[in-house]
Amino acid sequence: MVRCVYSIRLYEHLKKFCQDRMYPLQLQETDYGHPAQKNEVSHINLTKFLNGLGCPFDLRDYQYNAVSHGIQNKRAILLSPTGSGKSFIIYNLLRWYINNFDKKILIVVPTTSLVEQMHKDFTDYGFDPELVHKIYSGKDKTTDKQIIISTWQSIYKFSKEWFEDFGCVFGDEVHL
């Protein structure tokens, strides 16, 4: 079971914070829209897309619901127990993102072993490992590849400009 929490709560808190203090709040439009906008999800089209990925595994209902929730809400925190297929959820979300947008994707994990595990999982799902770049100690930090898996420790000192190339960020192991 995946529990889907956060959709636009941070935006709503920020909006109230600014209103209470009479601060101006300006939303900057991007290709992905702003936090209050939602994507329409056609379950027929999404199912057709996901089935067409050629994965050797089928999404379980709770995984499909998490993918659908993430797409519809554009941002979310998905709470899921160990062994429930979080990497597979991330994989399906990133495949949808690649299909719909042309920006890089950053996946941030807490350890180098999880960088390697996520990379291996994507390969097991049928994804070309040459399309994914891994960043951690001792690895090259520059790449033209669209998907980057990294530890937060390897990138947190990077300049703001480095992050501007990313249209989508996934974090594994988020603690509230």
Predicted regions and their residues:
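Conserved RecA-like ASCE P-loop NTPase motor core of nucleic-acid helicases/translocases
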Residues: 103-111
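SF2 helicase catalytic motif II
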Residues: 152-154, 161-176
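N-terminal accessory nucleic-acid engagement/regulatory domains that precede
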Residues: 1-32
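Walker A/P-loop
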Residues: 72-97
